[in-house]
């Protein structure tokens, strides 16, 4: 489609390419001078910046206390894992063990937890996501299957286990899933 426009005109059109997470090809084009770069370095009016913290496993109880405080304020929480099941080769937290740990710390009937991962049938994933969207659950334990197409303003906290196992683009894609709401 762009090629037709270029061939149709004697003066080449200006092309504006926008991305929040550049793919390697786009990044290479900017590095090697094939694209001019404009930077939007401020947030839209009224949007609070996303706060990022790093905690080691030794601070897990502090993280759980923070989660409980956020849930008391009516907020929802994402907890993202790099693996669904335990790996024989990698020493990482996995979703299934993480879910069990969270379920012990956040028991029914006071708390409800959804679980979503790529090995689930689409109907089961949709059901669990809808429970989270409808605020029937306060915590969504998931893999990066939530990376695309999930925008729940009430879910203002995201915990990413073993964040070093994710690529920078993946982390950048996940970040907006947890927006800071107006209450701070």
Can you say where each PLM-predicted feature lies in the sequence?
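Inter-lobe coupling/hinge segments of SF2-like helicase ATPases
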Residues: 1-184
């Amino acid at each position: 489609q762009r090629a037709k426009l270029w061939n149709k005109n004697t003066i080449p059109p200006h092309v504006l390419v926008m991305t929040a997470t550049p793919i390697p090809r786009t990044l290479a084009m900017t590095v090697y001078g094939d694209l001019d770069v404009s930077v939007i370095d401020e947030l839209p009016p009224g949007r609070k910046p996303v706060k990022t913290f790093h905690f080691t496993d030794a601070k897990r109880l502090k993280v759980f206390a923070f989660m409980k405080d956020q849930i008391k304020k009516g907020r929802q929480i994402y907890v993202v894992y790099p693996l669904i099941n335990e790996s024989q080769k990698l020493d990482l937290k996995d979703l299934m063990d993480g879910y069990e740990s969270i379920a012990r710390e956040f028991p029914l009937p006071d708390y409800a937890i959804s679980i979503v991962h790529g090995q689930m049938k689409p109907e089961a994933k949709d059901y669990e996501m809808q429970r989270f969207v409808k605020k029937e659950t306060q915590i969504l334990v998931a893999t990066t299957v939530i990376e695309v197409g999930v925008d729940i303003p009430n879910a203002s906290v995201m915990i990413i286990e073993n964040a070093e196992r994710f690529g920078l683009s993946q982390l950048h894609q996940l970040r907006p899933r947890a927006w800071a709401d107006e209450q701070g």
